[in-house]
UniProtKB/Swiss-Prot annotation:
Residues 128-149, 195-258, 376-404 are annotated as: Disordered. It comes from Xenopus laevis (African clawed frog). GO terms for biological process: proteasome assembly. It holds the Pfam family RPN13_C. CDD domains: PH_Rpn13. PANTHER family: ADHESION REGULATING MOLECULE 1 110 KDA CELL MEMBRANE GLYCOPROTEIN (PTHR12225), PROTEASOMAL UBIQUITIN RECEPTOR ADRM1 (PTHR12225:SF0). This is Proteasomal ubiquitin receptor ADRM1-B. Residues 278-390 form the DEUBAD domain. The lineage of its organism: Eukaryota, Metazoa, Chordata, Craniata, Vertebrata.
Length: 404
């Protein structure tokens, strides 16, 4: 399963986006029932757009009513768009997700077939190789612009409401411009911005504040959003595909009312900064090379460990929360890449202030400040052991009281 995966947009169109779609073509939806798919006769439009937060959206809307039935956020390598060769009665395409059995079927409504292959190629290109977001102009202004996000209060609100997916996006190569942002904050720096006694104010900011920050509801979900507005079906063109088609070929966080902060603001500011120097923690450790499938296998075989990890699995109709999914998630290329990204960011010695925002113990924050991954891991393990002891002691006390 992909750790970056896909999830529906909370409110389609609520975030700023380019006025022009990356690719669009007329196509109808198809519903999957058992092993066959049947066409939805409404006139539709498939389009891909990149919103101001740099995320790629795969959308389908009814051309008659204008309502958007599907608005899915797609990450690279999540899915593949291809033609269903088994269907000979129409031009049927499937958006097949590489993790799970989720599939979305569409039938072409373009009058000519000459651009079908081009549309298919462009869909795959933009989904798996999205354009790089435009960086903010002006060097050396990162600290000032970060201050404009609202200082400690605003950043804490933003970071506290981030999902796992968004945090990985923030510290990833796109969000951080090659892990350059955190280490390049000098002067007041990230430490003073996150650890100051009060919020920093600014009269202006390079990023728009007209929109409220929207946080996706889960890290990975394959469900689509269905609008409640009634839709008037339109007559199907003569090329409507046959009902029987084999399906075997594929499948807002609230911020301060006076200072709405967007994840894209922080991302764009960090993306303009320079790559940090190596932290003080000595030789850099890549967690991806440590937490290998071979090492994790006996740990994941423990039923107690599985039970503790299960609630953190992505949820969705085609994403069962099972022990197998835990294994699939931790061994996926996306998860391994996220580990490497986090290792590099932690080794930079600049994640201490960020870690303190998540309520981590002082030892862990100190290790993060030094870029000492080994000390950070030991601090986290010590904290976990202490919590387990406290929980066990509390349970024993409750049992003793019940006996009395």
């Amino acid at each position: 399963m992909s750790s970056g995966a896909l999830f529906p947009s909370l409110v389609p169109g609520s975030r700023g986006s380019s006025s022009k779609y990356l690719v669009e073509f007329r196509a109808g939806k198809m519903s999957l029932k058992g092993s066959t798919v049947t066409p939805d006769k409404r006139k539709g439009l498939v389009y891909i757009q990149q919103t101001d937060d740099s995320l790629i959206h795969f959308c389908w809307k009814d051309r008659t009513s204008g309502s958007v039935d599907d608005d899915l956020i797609i990450f690279p390598d999540d899915c593949e768009f291809k033609r269903v060769s088994q269907c000979t009665t129409g031009r049927v395409y499937v958006l097949k997700f590489k993790a799970g059995s989720k599939r979305l079927f569409f039938w072409m409504q373009e009058p000519k077939t000459d651009k079908d292959e081009e549309h298919c190629r462009k869909v795959n290109e933009y989904l798996n190789n999205p354009p790089m977001p435009g960086a903010l102009g002006g060097s050396g202004s990162g600290s000032h612009e970060l201050s404009a996000l609202g200082g400690e209060g605003g950043l804490q609100s933003l970071l506290g409401n981030m999902s796992h997916n968004q945090l990985m996006q923030l510290i990833g190569p796109t969000g951080l411009g090659g892990l350059g942002g955190l280490g390049a904050l000098t002067g007041p720096g990230l430490a003073s911005l996150l650890g100051s006694g009060g919020p920093t104010t600014s009269s202006s900011s390079s990023s728009s504040r007209s929109q409220s920050a929207a946080v996706t509801p889960s890290s990975t979900t394959s469900s689509t959003r269905t609008t409640s507005a009634p839709v008037a079906p339109a007559a199907a063109p003569a090329t409507t595909p046959s009902p029987a088609v084999s399906s075997n070929d594929g499948a807002s966080a609230a911020t301060s009312p006076t200072q709405a902060i967007q994840l894209s603001d922080l991302q764009n500011i960090l993306a303009t900064m320079n790559v940090p120097a190596t932290g003080e923690g000595g030789q850099q450790v890549d967690l991806a090379s440590v937490l290998t499938p071979e090492i994790m296998a006996p740990i994941l075989a423990n039923a107690e460990v599985q039970e503790r990890l299960m609630p953190y699995l992505p949820s969705g109709e085609s994403l069962p929360q099972t022990a197998d999914e835990i294994q699939n998630t931790l061994t996926s290329p996306q998860f391994q890449q996220a580990l490497s990204m986090f290792s590099a960011a932690l080794a930079s010695g600049q994640l201490g202030p960020l870690m303190s925002q998540f309520g981590l113990p002082a030892d862990a924050v100190d290790a993060a400040n030094k870029g000492d991954i080994e000390a950070f891991a030991k601090a986290m393990q010590s904290t976990s052991s202490q919590k387990e002891r406290e929980s066990s002691e509390k349970k024993e006390e409750e049992e003793d009281m019940s006996l009395d």
